[in-house]
């Protein structure tokens, strides 16, 4: 079975109950299955809290955080520091052998600047799988922040969904986008079991899929096309379903290529 990339998002990093559910599921899964797991995370809520404390403006365009040069250090500290080490501490608590990384380690993901207007915001492309494969084969679960670096040595804030997609591409792995939403909802608030490009474009055009969810859906669609396999969007709230989810059973919205 191919490795599985699990992207953790939403309020999960700021919610002890959520972390407990996810790491309990990861521990149970690792005890009963041999599938290799990679965790990728952002930490938007942590960044927002830090920015507010420092009285710095929070600006987003189409779900992507505008990152001026004077803020990239703060965001790097929040994501590659606080968020990453928080998850590593939970992994230790649940006896999960883990290693904390950022996208530049071993050139796991190749990153370039997305645009001058967004500042230090990076575009993620597949990189070198050697380091990840070495860690996975040794029994470790890599926990990777969405901070990257360009070939000029400039730190970049990468959308975590897109970072997870690039890592799945690098490894030829399956991808699950795990957050506080159970999947994509239709206009009546009902979960959509599966969705393709055409259906997604219709929902975006009608304003049903908006803001950060557009980035999430586009990242999942891009991953599904690139990997030529389905990608799942699901919630951590349904802890009893997570083991099935990690085994490839759809429990949220399945994104079709």
Swiss-Prot record:
Keyword Ribosomal protein: no
Main location: cytoplasm
Any GO CC annotation of this UniProt entry: cytoplasm
GO molecular function, one term: acetylglutamate kinase activity
GO terms, biological process: arginine biosynthetic process via ornithine; L-arginine biosynthetic process
Binding residue positions for substrate: 43-44, 65, 157
EC supergroup of this enzyme: transferase
Swiss-Prot/TrEMBL catalytic activity: N-acetyl-L-glutamate + ATP = N-acetyl-L-glutamyl 5-phosphate + ADP
Pathway noted in the entry: Amino-acid biosynthesis; L-arginine biosynthesis; N(2)-acetyl-L-ornithine from L-glutamate: step 2/4
Marked site (Transition state stabilizer) residue numbers: 7, 216
Coiled coil (UniProt feature): none
Binding site residues for ATP: 180-185, 208-210
Keyword terms, alphabetized: Amino-acid biosynthesis, Arginine biosynthesis, ATP-binding, Cytoplasm, Kinase, Nucleotide-binding, Transferase
Listed EC numbers: 2.7.2.8
Subunit architecture: Homodimer.
Protein name (record): Acetylglutamate kinase
Source species of the chain: Photorhabdus laumondii subsp. laumondii (strain DSM 15139 / CIP 105565 / TT01) (Photorhabdus luminescens subsp. laumondii)
Lineage, highest ranks first: Bacteria, Pseudomonadati, Pseudomonadota, Gammaproteobacteria, Enterobacterales
Protein encoded by which gene: argB
């Amino acid at each position: 079975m191919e490795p599985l990339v699990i992207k953790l998002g939403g309020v999960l990093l700021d919610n002890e109950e959520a972390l407990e559910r996810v790491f309990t599921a990861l521990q149970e899964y690792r005890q009963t299955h041999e599938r290799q797991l990679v965790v990728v995370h952002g930490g938007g809520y942590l960044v927002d809290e830090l920015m507010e404390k420092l009285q710095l403006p929070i600006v987003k365009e189409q779900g992507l955080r505008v990152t001026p040069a004077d803020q990239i250090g703060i965001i790097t500290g929040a994501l590659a520091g606080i968020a990453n080490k928080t998850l590593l501490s939970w992994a230790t608590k649940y006896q999960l052998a883990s290693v904390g990384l950022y996208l530049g380690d071993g050139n796991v993901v190749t990153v370039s600047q997305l645009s001058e207007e967004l500042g230090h915001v990076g575009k993620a492309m597949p990189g070198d799988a050697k380091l990840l494969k070495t860690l996975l084969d040794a029994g470790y679960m890599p926990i990777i922040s969405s901070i990257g670096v360009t070939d000029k040595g400039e730190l970049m804030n990468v959308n975590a969904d897109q970072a997870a997609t690039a890592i799945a591409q690098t490894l030829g792995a399956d991808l699950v986008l795990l957050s506080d939403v159970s999947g994509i909802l239709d206009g009546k608030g009902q979960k959509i079991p599966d969705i393709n490009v055409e259906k997604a474009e219709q929902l975006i055009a009608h304003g049903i899929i908006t803001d950060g969810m557009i980035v999430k859906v586009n990242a999942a669609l891009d991953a599904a096309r690139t990997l030529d396999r389905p990608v799942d969007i699901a919630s951590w709230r349904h802890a009893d379903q997570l083991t099935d989810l990690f085994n490839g059973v759809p429990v949220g919205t399945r994104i079709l290529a």
